[in-house]
């Protein structure tokens, strides 16, 4: 340990220093100096490598003041040019294409669009797969260009808002339950057929059922009976000719015996009634029905 001596010197006084004065050099020498230089050189190399990697990443990713590559940052949001591939789910408030091009969503498996509430629960989902298109929602609706509902579906009912529902399949339309509609008709020059292969077919209307064929015939076929019944009104057959074909021809019985047979009589207004059969007509005797 070195002890330093301090001497007070006045002006004009000369003091000689001792010859054995010790001189100390301040600094880093030897292997410590070489290690420090090596460490600084290593830091400089790392800095150069980092700068080169940063420049390479900026060049590869196409970073620019307005965005990254085809992805541009605008005041309205993000604008993406060209085709892009998303490896993970995409969350966005609005997705739209340019004015002069269409929006294309494509996937090798399926495309799923989901809507969630504030709690994260799915409230609506559209899934486009290879075999089918699945829509999961409480209410599904398709509108026209002017906002008019064309088709809507709920758990209770399905509504078709077009002026006409057309089924072009060769087997027609199959309904497992009842159908409510104001009009059922076929295309021009085509047949209309209502069929129930294994059950009955019923048509009900509170104000009447109107069946009309403008350019053809109306045919009703049944393996059993065809019953035309009116509880309060009359059954009217309005035609120039009314024909009953394939009627059985009766055989002649004993004279003076009707055997419970009746003849059909007609009033001037077309009303039909029965009269006891006899050797001659008895319609005039029972014509008071026409009054």
UniProtKB/Swiss-Prot annotation:
Ribosomal protein among keywords: no
Coiled-coil region(s): none
One GO location term (cellular component): cytoplasm
Matches recorded under InterPro entries: Sarcoglycan, Sarcoglycan_gamma/delta/zeta
Cytoplasmic topological segments: 1-37
Annotated compartments: Cell membrane, Sarcolemma; Cytoplasm, Cytoskeleton
Listed transmembrane segments: 38-58
GO biological process: gene expression; membrane organization
Function: Component of the sarcoglycan complex, a subcomplex of the dystrophin-glycoprotein complex which forms a link between the F-actin cytoskeleton and the extracellular matrix.
Stated family: Belongs to the sarcoglycan beta/delta/gamma/zeta family.
Name of the protein this chain belongs to: Gamma-sarcoglycan
Gene this chain is encoded by: Sgcg
């Amino acid at each position: 340990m070195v002890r330093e001596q301090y001497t007070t010197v006045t002006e004009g006084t000369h003091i000689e220093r001792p010859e054995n004065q010790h001189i100390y050099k301040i600094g880093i020498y030897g292997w410590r100096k070489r290690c420090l230089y090596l460490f600084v050189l290593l830091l400089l190399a790392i800095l150069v490598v980092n700068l080169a990697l940063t420049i390479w990443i900026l060049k590869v990713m196409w970073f620019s003041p307005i965005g990254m590559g085809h992805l541009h940052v605008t005041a309205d949001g993000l604008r993406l040019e060209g085709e892009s591939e998303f490896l993970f789910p995409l969350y966005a408030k609005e997705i739209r294409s340019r004015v002069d091009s269409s929006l294309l969503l494509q996937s090798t498996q399926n495309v799923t669009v989901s809507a969630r509430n504030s709690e994260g629960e799915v409230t609506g989902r559209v899934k486009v797969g290879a075999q089918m298109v699945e829509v999961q929602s409480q209410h599904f609706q398709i509108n026209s260009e002017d906002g008019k509902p064309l088709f809507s579906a709920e758990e209770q009912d399905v509504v078709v808002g077009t002026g006409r529902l057309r089924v072009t399949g060769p087997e027609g339309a199959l309904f497992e339950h009842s159908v409510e509609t104001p009009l059922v008709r076929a295309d021009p020059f085509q047949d209309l057929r209502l069929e129930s292969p294994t059950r009955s077919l019923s048509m009900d209307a509170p104000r009447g059922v109107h069946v009309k064929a403008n350019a053809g015939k109306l045919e009703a076929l049944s393996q059993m009976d065809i019953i035309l019944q009116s509880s309060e009104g009359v059954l009217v057959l309005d035609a120039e000719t009314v024909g009953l074909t394939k009627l059985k021809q009766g055989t002649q019985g004993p004279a003076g015996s009707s055997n419970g047979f009746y003849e059909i009589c007609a009033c001037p207004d077309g009303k039909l009634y029965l009269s006891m059969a006899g050797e001659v007509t008895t319609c005039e005797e029972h014509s008071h029905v026409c009054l």
